[in-house]
Amino acid sequence: MPEFELYVEDRQVVTPGELLARGQVIASEGTYTSGDEVYSKVTGLVDIDGRRIRVIPLAGPYRPSPGDFVVGIVEEVKFSSWLIDVRAPLPAILHVSNALEEEVDLIETDLSRYYRPGDVITAVVREVDPVQRVELSLLEDDAPTRLGRLQGGQVVEIDPVKVPRVIGRKGSMIKMLKRVLGCDIVVGANGRIYVRAREEPKKERELLAVRAIREIERRSHLRGLTDWLKANLKRLSRW
């Protein structure tokens, strides 16, 4: 007899309580087990990778976790910190000790010389307390890209649970977007995405990138999305 049985297909939309698999599988996020059976906990897309099975929700708020890479917007400058909008229930706090390697005289220094309201930054979630207060850091060595202020470009926001589709399996979608559009694209776990064109015509490239990201969000439940989008981007691009 097989070691496990699957009752759904990869990328299939499932609902809470739906039987996904039975046997020796690894039940991951969005699932629960009863005996040797695995069920869906949410309405979402099945993701099967070998023995591992998970369900990616079709919609939901950003739930911060330590280690998350996020794109934030500075809301307020305090005496020794900044308040950052990361799309969490409460503003995140960025202490000066987690933002600057240099020592700063807080009596003499206005922190807005470093970051001011409206600035877009990349950061890593350092800590989340029981009431979902988030503490950020810009001093993490293992971040996927440089941390700190982002300049120029455009910012687009999507449902945070659609972020895995923008990235794609093994990074396939995001790599294709960067290559075809000639853009740097920074994807935050909080569903905020920064786009900046590397080549002319920059405005057109950025607008098409934003449009593409919106299409991914809208069509995230479809199979073959990467190939479909690649074909359409090549048709729509005029450079």
From Swiss-Prot:
SMART domains xrefs: KH, S1
Cellular component per GO, a single term: cytoplasm
CDD domains cross-referenced by the UniProt entry: KH-I_Rrp4_prokar, S1_Rrp4
Domain KH: 151-217
Biological process according to GO: CUT catabolic process; exonucleolytic trimming to generate mature 3'-end of 5.8S rRNA from tricistronic rRNA transcript (SSU-rRNA, 5.8S rRNA, LSU-rRNA); poly(A)-dependent snoRNA 3'-end processing; RNA catabolic process; U4 snRNA 3'-end processing
Broad class of where this protein is predominantly found: cytoplasm
All copies of domain S1 motif, residue ranges: 67-139
Keywords: Cytoplasm, Exosome, RNA-binding
Record GO terms (molecular function): poly(A) binding
Compartment(s) of residence: Cytoplasm
Pfam family, one: RRP4_S1
PROSITE patterns in UniProt: S1 (PS50126)
Domain of life: Archaea
InterPro entries: Exosome_RNA_bind1/RRP40/RRP4 (IPR026699), KH_dom (IPR004087), KH_dom_type_1 (IPR004088), KH_dom_type_1_sf (IPR036612), NA-bd_OB-fold (IPR012340), Rrp4 (IPR023474), RRP4_N (IPR054371), RRP4_S1 (IPR048565)
Record-stated family: Belongs to the RRP4 family.
Listed PANTHER family: EXOSOME COMPLEX COMPONENT RRP4, PNAS-3 RELATED
Main function: Non-catalytic component of the exosome, which is a complex involved in RNA degradation. Increases the RNA binding and the efficiency of RNA degradation. Confers strong poly(A) specificity to the exosome.
Subunit structure and binding partners: Component of the archaeal exosome complex. Forms a trimer of Rrp4 and/or Csl4 subunits. The trimer associates with a hexameric ring-like arrangement composed of 3 Rrp41-Rrp42 heterodimers.
Protein name: Exosome complex component Rrp4
Gene from which this protein is expressed: rrp4
